[in-house]
C-alpha cells in the first residue's frame, strides 16, 4: 500500500514545469541520469543557476553535451530534477514517520524537515543564496508553485496538525501550516557561523530538536 507522503511526492514530481524524476532503476537511462543529477547538483551548488555550464556538467558526467538533452529538456528542467532527487532522499524517513503514533508524528516531521533545510546542499544553496538562482525563480510559473504549496499544506494539516489539535478551525490550521513552512525556509537561510557565535554555540542537531519540540508543544497547547 502506497503511503500518503509517497502519493504526495508523486503528485508534486509529476507536475508539469517542476522537473522530472529519474527513469526506473532497471531502465537503460537510469545510470546516465543518476550521474548527471549528481554532477549537476554539485555544479549548481558551486556556481548557482546562471553560471552553471551545461557543457561542463556533461564533461563531468563523461558524456557529450547533446546527450543531456536526450534526458532533460533544458537547464531549468535539469536543475529542478536535481531538487526532486534531493527531496526524494527524505521520503524513506517521512514514510517511517507516518507509522508513528499520531502524537509523535508532528515533532518527528519537524525534526526531519528542519534538518533537511540545514544539510541538503542544493536546497540550502537555493534558500541562502537566492541571488544566484534569481533567473531560475523568475522562469517558474507562480501558479505551479502555488499548487505545490497547497498540496504540502493539505498534507501537513490532515496528517500532522489535525490529529493533535481539537480547538482550531480550518483557517487556524492553515495558518499554523504556513508558519511551519516559513520556519523551514528561514532555517535554510541560517549561515553555518550562526551556530558558532561566541556565547551561544549550539550543535545543529540540538538546535533542530529543541526548535521542533517548542513548535510541537506550542501547536498541541493551542
Residue ranges and their predicted role:
Residues 30-42, 46, 60, 77-100, ...:
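Alpha-helical structural segments
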Residues 61-72:
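Short hydrophobic/aromatic patch on the recognition helix
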Residues 104-133, 147, 151-154, 177, ...:
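Helical hydrophobic small-molecule/effector-binding pocket
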